[in-house]
Amino acid sequence: MATTASPQALAHGRFVRGSVSKVRRVLDQIRGRSYRDALIMLEFMPYRSTGPITKVLRSAVANAEHNMGLDPSNLVVSMASADMGPTMKRYRPRAQGRAYQIKKQTCHISIGVTPQDA
């Protein structure tokens, strides 16, 4: 039995500063919600990672509108994931000649939107 997959528009944000766990905490809350609800939630969440996530979400909706001709008002966040990016390592001078390592983490954000089954 052949099933036709609904079109999915993707957008990626690569090398975003922030840890994967903190970004996933936000993505888990918007997955499965409509585009409008997701934007409202992101606007009022108190997390720093909502800025880059909002940019990637808007890019995914723009891709759906421009490339596939879909209406933004009935789009749903069907896929939202964050993968680990490279870690920048820096050193901080400490007392008595020691140096502590500072890890500046990055992640890759992927968001996909599909039309709502109405």
UniProtKB/Swiss-Prot annotation:
GO biological process: translation
GO molecular function: rRNA binding; structural constituent of ribosome
GO cellular component terms attached to this protein's record: cytosolic large ribosomal subunit
UniProt-recorded name of the protein: Large ribosomal subunit protein uL22
Oligomer status and interactors: Part of the 50S ribosomal subunit.
InterPro entries in UniProt: Ribosomal_uL22 (IPR001063), Ribosomal_uL22_bac/chlpt-type (IPR005727), Ribosomal_uL22_bac/org-type (IPR047867), Ribosomal_uL22_CS (IPR018260), Ribosomal_uL22_sf (IPR036394)
Origin: domain of life: Bacteria
Pfam family, one: Ribosomal_L22
Role this protein plays: This protein binds specifically to 23S rRNA; its binding is stimulated by other ribosomal proteins, e.g. L4, L17, and L20. It is important during the early stages of 50S assembly. It makes multiple contacts with different domains of the 23S rRNA in the assembled 50S subunit and ribosome.
Keywords associated with the record: Ribonucleoprotein, Ribosomal protein, RNA-binding, rRNA-binding
Family to which the UniProt record says this protein belongs: Belongs to the universal ribosomal protein uL22 family.
